[in-house]
Structure formats: C-alpha cells, structure tokens
Amino acid sequence: MKSNILYLKYGLSIAAALIAYFLIIRVLGMHDNHWLRILNGVIVAYGIYAVIKKKKDQEKEAFEYFSGFWLGILTGAVATVTFVAFMAVYLFHIEPAFAERLLKHIAGSIGGPEILLLILTIEGISSSVILSLTFMQKFKVSRNITKKHAHA
C-alpha cells in the first residue's frame, strides 16, 4: 500500500476514533472532565505507531528513517485537521455553551472558540511530531556495528 493511502487511511481512522470517543463521553455527560482527554493521546499514539509499523513491515530492509517519520507526521496531521473540523462544527453550531465553559477553564476570558481550535491544532501537530520521533527510535534500521562483528 502506498504511503499516501496509508496516512489517509490511518489518519482518518484516528480521527474517527477521537470523534467516537468524544461523542461517547458527551453522551455520558463527562465531556467537561479535562482528564479524560488523556485517552486522546493514547488513541493518536496507537494510530501513529500502527502506521509506521505497517510501513516498516511492507518495506522491510528498504525502510528509511525519514519516510517513517514523515508518514507519522502526515498521519497525525490528517487526524488533527479532521478532528479540529469536527470540533469547529460542534463548538460553533451544536453546543456553543461547551466552548464557553472550556474557555473559562483553559484560556480565561481571552478569545473565543477559535482559540480552542488553535490549541487543538497545536496539540495535535506537536504530539504527532513527538510521537513520530519517539516511535522511529524503535523502528529505525540501525547502521551500527554490533559488538560480535566489531571483534572479528
């Protein structure tokens, strides 16, 4: 499967999982609990890990560090943009009062719902970069000489 298909498939899957999780905690009346956002990170981390692993499994020895790293970032970007678009609709049209409650807790009285969308975008992109770098440490092909071969 080509990388552009992978990042779209996994990015949209991550976004769907984030949206489903948000709607579930919304139905349960727990969407005001900010600590439940931690699971968002777990969902994104799993998706980025899975897409990089899939690419490495496909390419085997031809797998390159930069292509895996970039794939993780693109996957996270697709997930972020999709989720932020959903949240924009939710905050502006479905439950504007939720945005007001979040603003009081997070940003004080600065800005409107747009600041929340900016925060979500920055969080999503930055966590995608950090997670991609982290997972590539596991998946990168080592070019180091092993101790066994160094003494031969």
Please report, for each region that a protein language model flagged, where it lies by residue.
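Membrane-helix interface/capping segments
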Residues: I52-G68, F92
